[in-house]
Amino acid sequence: QKSTLDEAINLLVDKIHSVQPNEIAGHIGDMINMENALSFKKFFEKLKSENLEFREKDFYINPDEKMNYIFNSSIAGIEEADLILLVGTNPRYEASILNARIRKTFVQKKIPIFSIGNPGDLTYEYEIIGDSTEDIKKIVNKEHDFSQKLLSAKKPLIIIGESALELKSGGYVFEEFKKFLTKNNLINENWNGLNILVQNASTVGLLDLKILQNKKEKSSSFFHDLKNRKFKLLYLLGS
C-alpha cells in the first residue's frame, strides 16, 4: 500500500504508542553511518527501550575498553610480528587485504604461522595446533607444546575471528588470551598483538557509540527475546 512520508510517520507513532518499551526492539545494519546510528540510539533512549542491537549473530564482545574489539596491531603492524596465531578465522575470505599482508610477511620473513581450527588454503604455510576450546585452555595453562613458542616470541600476533566468539566458550577464548598475554608482558606499551577480526564495517564505530554498553554476555536477551517472539515492534535501521 502506497503512503506519503507523513502517513508512514503517523503509523509508526501509533504503533509505538500501542506497545510497552520492553516490547520494542531495534536493529542497526552493517552499512549505517555513525550519525544515523547515534540518532537511533538517542531515539531508543527516549523510548526507554534497551533492546538495541547491531550484531547479526550472537557473538561475545567485551565493550568495556576499546582494545577489546579492535585490530590492535594494525594491518601494517603485521610486518612487525615474529609469530602469528589464527583462532577461528579464515582471513583469506574474511579480510583479503589483511591476508595479503600476512602472506607478504611470511614470504619475506618466513615467520611461523599457526591456527586453531582448519581454515583451508590461505596461500601460505601454517600449522594447525588444535581445533577446540580445550586446546586453548592448554595453551594458556602452559600445558601445550605451543605455549613456550608463544612465550618466546617478542611480538606475537593473535587474530581471533567471530567464529570463535560465536562459541559458547567465546568469552573464555578472548578473556583468557588477553589475561595470558598481559600476565606475560606480551601486551605492553610497545606492542599489542591481540586482534579481533570483525565482519561488519560498522561494528567498531557502533561499539564506540556504546550501543551494547556493558552487555558483554554472549547469550544476550535481544537474541533470546527475538527468537521467542517477545517483541511486538521491530524497528530496522538499514538492517
Where are these regions (language model features)?
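Catalytic alpha/large subunits of respiratory electron-transfer oxidoreductases
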Residues: 1-239
